[in-house]
C-alpha cells in the first residue's frame, strides 16, 4: 500500500481577525455540549479526511469565490459510524438526535481549511438568516484574503 492509498488528513484551523477574535470560536462555545460533539466529530470524520471533496457529497456546498459551506444534518451516532458496519459501530447514549448546523470555510494550499463561522440552521432556517450568515462569511473571507 502506498501513501497515495491513505492521503494525509487536511489540517483544520480557525480563523481569527486582526484583534485575535474568532467568530467560529465564539459561536462554538455557545453551542450545547451535544452540538459541540457533533461539530468535533464532523471535523474529524468528514472534513479532515475529505477536504474539498466534501462538495462532491451531501456534506458540502461551494458558495462561490472560495467560500464553502460544511453542511451538518446528522446525529452524533451517524457521524461516528460513517463507513463502519456491523458490530464495530458505536452508540453514544442520546446520540441519535439529528442537528442542522452550517459552518463556513475556505481551503488554502494543499491541506489547510480555515473555519470562519457557523450557525444553527435548525433554530432559524429562514432565507433571510441564511443570506445574512453567508454575507458575514464573505466579509470574513475577504478580510482573510487581505491578511494572507
What do these predicted ranges mean?
Residues 1-99, 120-148:
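Basic, Lys/Arg-enriched alpha-helical interface segments
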Residues 101-106:
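Short, surface-exposed beta-strand/loop micro-motifs that present aromatic residues
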Residues 107-115:
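Active-site beta-strand-loop-beta-strand hairpin of nuclease catalytic cores
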Amino acid at each position: 500500500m502506498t501513501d497515495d492509498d491513505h492521503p494525509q488528513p487536511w489540517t483544520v484551523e480557525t480563523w481569527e481577525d486582526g484583534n485575535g477574535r474568532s467568530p467560529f470560536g465564539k459561536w462554538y462555545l455557545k453551542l450545547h455540549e451535544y452540538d459541540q460533539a457533533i461539530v468535533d466529530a464532523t471535523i474529524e470524520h468528514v472534513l479532515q479526511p475529505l477536504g474539498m471533496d466534501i462538495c462532491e457529497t451531501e456534506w458540502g456546498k461551494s458558495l462561490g469565490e472560495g467560500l464553502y459551506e460544511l453542511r451538518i444534518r446528522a446525529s452524533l451516532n451517524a457521524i461516528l459510524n460513517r463507513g463502519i458496519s456491523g458490530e464495530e459501530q458505536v452508540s453514544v447514549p442520546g446520540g441519535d438526535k439529528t442537528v442542522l448546523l452550517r459552518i463556513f470555510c475556505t481551503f488554502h494550499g494543499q491541506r489547510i481549511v480555515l473555519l470562519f463561522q457557523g450557525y444553527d440552521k435548525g433554530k432559524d432556517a429562514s432565507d433571510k438568516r441564511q443570506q445574512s450568515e453567508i454575507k458575514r462569511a464573505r466579509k470574513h473571507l475577504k478580510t482573510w484574503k487581505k491578511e494572507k
